Amino acid sequence: RLTKSKLPFDSYLFIQYTKKAVWNVFRESLPMRDLNFNPGIGLGHLIIRHNKYIGKAYLMLEHESNGKDSIDSRSWNKITFSWALVLNDNWETQFKTWIPIIDGENNKDILKYNGIFQFAVNYRTCNKRLQIGALITQRKAWFGFNTQLELSYKFNKRENQFFFIQYY
């Protein structure tokens, strides 16, 4: 969060940065296969109903890159809109869509691989120690999509350490 003051529509300005590393754990030498960098700046809005938090919505400008140049580059920018809604104590849904900003000839087919929207559903047990999630990314073709399945388990109630596994 960049400011504590409220902006119009009770929004706030924030920055984000994520980095994803893709590993091939079955390979003995050089198991790291790919890196992905994703900085962004956005406006956020908490969704409150009857004095209770039920979700959040974001409007962002994001950059995504594998850090390479020339023909190996997968760099692109996008304007994204996303929301997350808490359905009850155990279930949450998320949705994210984007408008790509593609610069000329570079990566003009990026939507073929990175899609046009994502939808996720997460389940968390009442004691908040086990969480299961599924994320579907719709690619350009109507019946083409990527799926991620995630499982995390919190070892100790008092610690913030998890066992996490993801299938992509």
Q: Where on the chain are the PLM-derived regions?
A:
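Outer-membrane pore/translocation modules
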Residues: S5-G144, Q166-Y167
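Predominantly the C-terminal beta-signal and adjacent terminal strand-loop region
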Residues: W142-Y168
